[in-house]
Structures are given as C-alpha cells and as structure tokens.
Amino acid sequence: YTTDANGEGPSWASSLFEDNAEYGFGMHIGVEALRSRIQHTMEENMDKVDEDIATLFKDWIANRQFSVRTREIRDILVPTLEALNTDFAKEIWDLKQYLIKNSQWIMGGDGWAYDIGYGGLDHVLASNEDVNILVVDTEVYSNTGGQASKSTPTGAVAKFAASGKPVKKKDLAAIAM
C-alpha cells in the first residue's frame, strides 16, 4: 500500500490461486456492504442532526456512486463528524475511508480469464456490478512456456501446438458486452 500527501493511494491484494474474479469481486462486495452501512446510519440519524449535516448526508446518499463528489463531501463531513459527540457519528467516522467511491480493478492473465478462472469471471460480468477488469492477453499460457490456450488465435503455432491451433480464439470482449 502506498499513499500520497493526503494519506491516500492504491492498494493491491492478490490470492495465491487463479481466483482473481472471485477475490476482487469479494473485495468489492465487502466495500459496498460497509458503504451501505454508512448510508443506513445516515438515514437512521438524519433527524438527529442539524440541517447542514442532514444536507451532507442526503448529498452523500444521492451521489454515493460518484468518486469526485463523495471525496468533496468526505472532506467536509469528516471534520464535522469529529465535532459531534454521538455514537452514530463515531460509527461513520470509523468508516471514513469508505465514504469515497473507489475504483475496483480485477486483473489477471489470459490463462486465468479464458480458462481456469472463466467461471468466476463470467459470474462477475453477469452481476453488472461497478468493477473494472483488465486481462493481460499474451495469447498463450506464459507461465508454462507458451502452450496454446483458449486465447490463442486459430492457426497459431505454440509449444505443444506445432501444427497450429485448430479452433477459434474465445472472444472474451464480445462475451463481456
């Protein structure tokens, strides 16, 4: 984890298995559960705060899927929460890192995306959740010395496929649409 001058920055996590989709999706679902908890706490306590704070709560709820706006609201809301001496303000303050809508990325190679991890990838795509997926497509299994894979184009010569791959490459981009 590395941070900028504001103490913010990208984080990286990976699993030892070819389950990038499931792992990344689980991280996304976990973050969204915490953000839903923030929203619920705001909604339950809207009538216990002054109008300015209630307006911030409403603004955050209305814009919770927008990174730039949630950052702006967070910058105003966190110092305000620090000044309140209530359990609900402390609960939201404790979850302040989740006030900003993050950008969730799931990354992996073509062996994962086209083959061994395709079931998980298909599940993530079908969920229609707001995650980004990056597939590094070398068109062969790079970790095995270049064997042909489902991402290898028709006719390509690769290790253990010296006469060329006989079937068409899986069209992952079309499947994702």
Regions from the PLM with identified roles:
Residues Y1-A21:
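Terminal amphipathic helices with adjacent charged low-complexity linkers/tails
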Residues M27-V31, I38-T41, N85, E91-M177:
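Thiamine diphosphate
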Residues E18-E91:
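N-terminal leader/propeptide and maturation segments of large enzyme subunits in energy/redox metabolism
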